[in-house]
Amino acid sequence: MIAFIEPFLASKSLANNSQQSYRYDLRQFCQQVGQRINPETLALYQQSLSGLTVAAKKRKLSTVNQFLYYLYQQRVLADYFKMDDRIEASFSLKPQLTRLDTSAFYAETAFLKGQLIALLILELGLTPSEIAGLRLADFDLGLQVLRLQSHRGIRVMTLSRTLLPFLERAAEAQQLYLFDHDAKPFSRQWFFNQLRDFLESIGCAELSAQSLREQFILNEKAAGKSIIEVAQLLGLKSPITLEKYYKM
């Protein structure tokens, strides 16, 4: 089925960002169902989306349903299949924060800068402003640490093995800043734009820098870090703003 993805995309008038999203979602779908498309495999695929947000589920189901219709039109499939993409969002007075499946953040992408920005927030809890000020000299990739200096002092942060390859690729450039614009940092808006484009490309347009930072907090809490330890990692004066995450 993977062989039909590119002809399908060519049959549609899609912006580059949307095309990247469609391609990613369809490859993921084909890898999961293989050559067997039937009610059982589609039900298993739909079940695999249970950990995603409502917006992400609807996007993926819509993309796959369009692909299934295309395969039927091309007589690749003898029967027309369509998954129910009517998803009821659950509402509550207090939004429930849950840990997300972030495997898509590490997959191959054309949006390398946006991907690295997202991973720095997700894995280190950095803000776009902090990322803008990062210099290559702040990183010791051999020791796998980042030394982040601010008016509150120096924070030493451990770089995970999963993050390291992305930083090594970025560090190959001979420049001052990690994200360098003629030896000057880019504007905050540039960082938000890069992040937005990457998130849209993996079907997570509803996420933001703030929600990725919340994922960092939830992941650190799940790893057993205390509220004080997480506050220190984030460079906060007080852990008060983190209390809502620890009362969940």
Swiss-Prot record:
The keyword Aminoacyl-tRNA synthetase does not apply. One of its GO terms (molecular function) is tyrosine-based site-specific recombinase activity. Keywords: Cytoplasm, DNA integration, DNA recombination, DNA-binding. It is found in: Cytoplasm. GO terms for cellular component: cytoplasm. InterPro entries: CB (IPR044068), DNA_brk_join_enz (IPR011010), Integrase-like_cat_sf (IPR013762), Integrase_catalytic (IPR002104), Integrase_recombinase_N (IPR010998), Tyrosine_recombinase_XerD-like (IPR020876). Residues 1-72 form the Core-binding (CB) domain. Putative tyrosine recombinase. Not involved in the cutting and rejoining of the recombining DNA molecules on dif(SL) site. Belongs to the 'phage' integrase family. XerD-like subfamily. This is Tyrosine recombinase XerD-like. It comes from Streptococcus equi subsp. zooepidemicus (strain MGCS10565). The lineage of its organism: Bacteria, Bacillati, Bacillota, Bacilli, Lactobacillales.
